Amino acid sequence: MEMELELNLIDLIDADTLSTIEQAFCDMTEMAAGISDQHGTPITAHCNTSAFCRLIKSSKTGRIRCERCDRQGAALAMENRAAVFYRCHAGLIDFAAPITIQDRILGSFVGGQVIVGEPPDRETAVQQAQELDLDPQAYLDAMRQIPVVTEEQINDAAEFLYALSNILSSIGCSRY
């Protein structure tokens, strides 16, 4: 019986190249992004992380919820083998696209941290801040800085992200 070795994205495409591609995406879309391996472990430092998300992640509960949302979004993208949208625990829109090589899922490209439509109302935001043991006013101030985008913008960004994921897959496949 032949044992199959675990293939890792980082073995096929170096972290600097992944970071450069991620940063180009962030610069173009002004959205947050990050690349994780097949287990949901970040390979790159996320770029364009909003002040709102940094505030939430400063809370232990918030950080755990954010990590869970990222893993669930990446898993959904990997399961569907396509770019997917999802609403995070804080009400922001995120998206994820799988990175595959020869039908093996090696990671995902996640992005977003934006609002489509109306932001949560003040009462909901204050309640969320209290659940995370965060200062409600700081939470509201940070929430006001979150980019508000149209559905078309988020669709375009997700499609571009998926195209980038396919390019990463091609690069990795050529090195495999």
For each predicted feature, which ranges?
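Sensory/regulatory domains in signal-transduction proteins
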Residues: 68-130, 145, 152-156, 160, ...
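Regulatory/sensor and coupling segments of signal-transduction and defense proteins
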Residues: 138-149, 166, 173-176
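Signal-transducing alpha-helical linker
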Residues: 10, 17, 153-156, 160-176
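Residue-level signal for secondary-structure boundary elements
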Residues: 30-33, 64-67, 151, 169, ...
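Short coil/turn segments at secondary-structure junctions
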Residues: 5-9, 145-148, 152
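Active-site gating loops and adjacent loop-to-helix segments of metal-dependent hydrolytic enzymes
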Residues: 130-136
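Structured interaction and signal-relay segments at domain junctions
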Residues: 2-91
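Alpha-helix initiation and N-capping motif
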Residues: 49, 70-71, 122, 136-139
